[in-house]
A protein has these predicted regions:
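Short, well-formed alpha-helical segments that are part of the catalytic scaffolds
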Residues: 19-33
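Membrane-interface aromatic/basic loop that binds lipid-linked glycans or pyrophosphate carriers
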Residues: 281-345, 355-363, 382
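Cell-envelope/extracellular polymer assembly enzymes that use nucleotide-activated donors
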Residues: 9-12, 30, 40, 199
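A conserved acidic beta->alpha catalytic loop
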Residues: 30, 37, 45-54, 73
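Glycine-rich, basic loop-to-helix element that forms the pyrophosphate-binding segment
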Residues: 71-88
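Donor-binding/catalytic cores of nucleotide-activated saccharide
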Residues: 98-215, 220-238, 303-307
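Short aromatic/hydrophobic "clamp" motif used to bind/position activated sugar donors
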Residues: 93
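Hydrophobic, well-ordered beta-alpha structural blocks that scaffold small-molecule cofactor pockets
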Residues: 334-452
Length: 452
């Protein structure tokens, strides 16, 4: 065994830093406070002007695991992460941001899972939260079906159904990557103002032979849900998403992966374009991007391999066609989410669920007056599934109208309802507690469909 092998850390943590002084110390403390200690922390200072470099140097003086690279000029997150990867020595790579915080057992649980399962990629829970709620510890309990599918044995997403890839976020910060997987496939972050991680993460997930999720349902990464000065990618231009996936498609074709995985690609592209439109805070720019998709963008996506595109299922092909046939102002894309896809892929299963309760004279309420609630109600209406009420615990939503229903509180409907079907993810335990000893059965539609 060489000296290099002996001193090689198990994990290399790459952290780009740009004007993150408001939260940087907190982020560093949550890394240095990890129960797992065999790592190096590579901080890339991207010409910060707010004292971030001084904070990094202060911590470096007290902990030899910290190294600092200074960019000669402001280059952005992609350049910084790529530079950090070049000097990384760890068996696994992790990418963190300088304004987030991390559960103290994150790396211990992730690395243990990686070694036990011989994984190329380990994923774990994350949550977008506001700064004032970032210290609230949260669990997101998995269903048994979800655990069996994603946590207990490693898998290759290329062997799973295309829609399942949608459940894996394309942010880099909730994953451990085997460094050899990244280096052997020459994966780097794309030089884009935003969305520079999409190509890197998507290709890594497709190329990984063994991916697994940490079985523990504690949230591991708390991502600040804001456009803070600590984030390098502030400008969510939807065109960056388009460019990222065009590169993915071209790379898949070059690696002879497209014929086998074309559906995985097109599913992800459709929903990512939809998400990009919704994420752009500049309405005029979003409208211009939509016009680009109508005029030429969708045709370019189709033409990566028109033969493969023709073999797609009708649901996704119709989705792409909607970009061309509907105008931006119609807002049709707002309701094209993952729940809707899984509902339509499991019509018979969902129909049987409703028929079971209706045959026993049980009345059903939908819990959740948000996007998922609207999607579920529209699905029920189209398939003649009877819903008696809509309930939400938000006082702002109670009394408003959703799909012809007046949104009620639990207290208002609890005497008349025997079944509640939850539309939103990860609130099952909260709803069960709210129902208490009332004689109401609670079903989580996302768990039922193995989305959560």
């Amino acid at each position: 065994m060489s000296q290099e092998d002996v001193i090689m850390p198990k994990i290399s943590i790459v952290m780009p830093v740009y004007n993150a002084s408001k939260y940087l110390e907190e982020a560093l403390c949550s890394v240095l406070g990890q129960t797992f200690t065999d790592y190096e922390l590579i901080c890339i200072n991207d010409c910060s002007t707010d004292g971030s470099l001084e904070t990094l140097r202060t911590y470096q003086e007290t902990d030899s695991r910290i190294s600092i690279l200074n960019n000669p000029e402001h280059r952005g997150a992609a350049y910084s992460r790529n530079r950090g990867m070049k000097v990384a020595r760890g068996e696994y790579l992790a990418f963190l941001d300088g304004d987030d915080i991390f559960d103290e057992a994150m790396f211990m649980k992730a690395y243990r899972t990686a070694k036990e399962k011989l994984a190329d990629i380990v994923t774990y829970q994350y949550l977008h939260v506001s700064s004032e709620n970032i210290h609230n510890k949260i669990n997101r309990d998995y269903s048994e079906g979800y655990m069996n599918r994603y946590c207990r044995q490693p898998f290759s997403l290329s062997e799973y159904e295309p829609a399942e890839l949608l459940q894996f976020p394309l942010g880099p910060w909730n994953k451990l990557y085997r460094r050899s997987l990244i280096e052997d496939n020459h994966l780097t972050f794309q030089d884009l103002p935003s969305g520079n991680d999409l190509y890197f993460v998507f290709m890594a997930l497709l190329l990984s032979k063994k991916t697994v999720m940490v079985e523990d349902s504690h949230v591991m990464v708390y991502v600040r849900d804001h456009f803070s000065s600590g984030r390098i990618s502030l400008n969510r231009d939807p065109m960056c998403t388009y460019r990222a996936f065009m590169k993915v498609g071209q790379e898949m074709a070059a690696l002879s992966m497209f014929d086998k995985l074309y559906a995985h690609f097109y599913y992800r592209v459709f929903y990512s374009l939809r998400d990009a439109l919704l994420a752009d805070g500049n309405r005029e720019r979003a409208k211009q991007f939509y016009g680009f998709l109508q005029q030429e963008g969708i045709d370019h996506v189709r033409s990566i391999d028109s033969g493969c595109y023709d073999r797609l299922d009708e649901y996704i092909k119709n989705g792409f066609q909607c970009f061309i046939e509907n105008d931006f102002e119609s807002g049709w894309y707002r309701e094209e989410n993952i729940l809707k896809l899984f509902l339509y892929q499991n019509v018979n299963k969902v129909t049987a669920l409703f028929e079971k309760y209706e045959s026993h004279g049980k009345k059903i309420a939908i819990w959740g007056a948000g996007e998922n609630g609207r999607v579920l109600l529209e699905f029920c209406r189209r398939h003649n599934m009877h819903v008696s009420a809509v309930v939400d615990r938000s006082k702002d939503k109670q009394g408003t109208e959703l799909c012809g229903f007046k949104v009620a509180s639990l207290q208002e409907i609890s005497d008349d309802i025997q079944v509640i079907i939850i539309s939103a993810c990860f609130i099952y335990e909260d709803v069960v507690r709210a129902v208490g000893d009332k004689n109401i059965e609670v079903i989580d539609i996302n768990r039922f469909l193995c989305i959560a």
